[in-house]
Amino acid sequence: MTRFNSVVLDVDSTLSGVEGIDWLASLRGAEVEAWSGSLTARAMEGLIPIEAVYGERMGIVRPTLSEIQELSAIYIDRVAPGAREALAELREHDVELVMVSGGLREAILPLAKELGIREKRVHAVSVFFGSEGQYTGFDERSLMTRQHGKRTTVKEMALKGPVLAVGDGMTDCEIRPVVDGFAAFTGFMKRDPVVERADYVIDNFDQLRSLVLE
């Protein structure tokens, strides 16, 4: 028996111990890395809306295809301890697993495959490249680049309930009105405004498994 039939998972600092766009920013030097990290922290604590920073960061970072491929490997290398095993057990109990992320889809898809999450259940921001792998832009229409975009996306999916959302940031916490529970994940980053609003607080995937499976 399961307590939740669907689980919506954040990626950066939840499924994997990396903030993808900040990692890409680090390739542009310490100053850009610090600037990007500051914006991420403020957005994840709900101090600034995500749409106020997303396009600006991407316009400066401008990741190449090869850098996205390198980031893909880092997502897998830094996967949260116990995540593979816990998610495999949830799948065995027919729990629907969904990734909803403000990260870059092409970098996240290999991690989804590694964790057994179907490609059509990965909601993230697509990035575009030219014939030589140079950055040409990102999907500016993506709901993931907007405040409350995750909430809208999850609502439109009409997942089988009860539904649990899991994440470390305010953009994850904001899903709460359209799901049945929200778990703040603190295994990589603890953000007090998120913890204060959470129904549950977990710091590892064994706890997630116990929460979902009765």
Range-by-range predicted roles:
Residues A83, Q147-K150, G169:
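Amphipathic coiled-coil/heptad-repeat helices and related helical stalk/stem segments
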Residues T2-S126:
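Alpha-helical substrate-recognition element adjacent to the catalytic core
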Residues Y200-Q207:
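Short acidic-hydrophobic, aromatic-tinged amphipathic segments that line or gate anion-handling sites
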Residues R84, A88, K155, C173-E174, ...:
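Alpha-helical segments flanking ligand/cofactor-binding loops in enzyme cores
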Residues L109-P162:
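Substrate-recognition "cap/lid" segment bordering the active-site pocket of phosphatases
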Residues R91, K113-G116, A158, P177, ...:
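Anion (oxyanion) recognition and catalysis
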Residues S210-E214:
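Short amphipathic alpha-helix with an adjacent loop that forms part of the alpha/beta core around
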Residues S101-G102, G161-A198:
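Acidic, Mg2+-coordinating phosphoryl-transfer loop and its flanking beta/alpha structural elements
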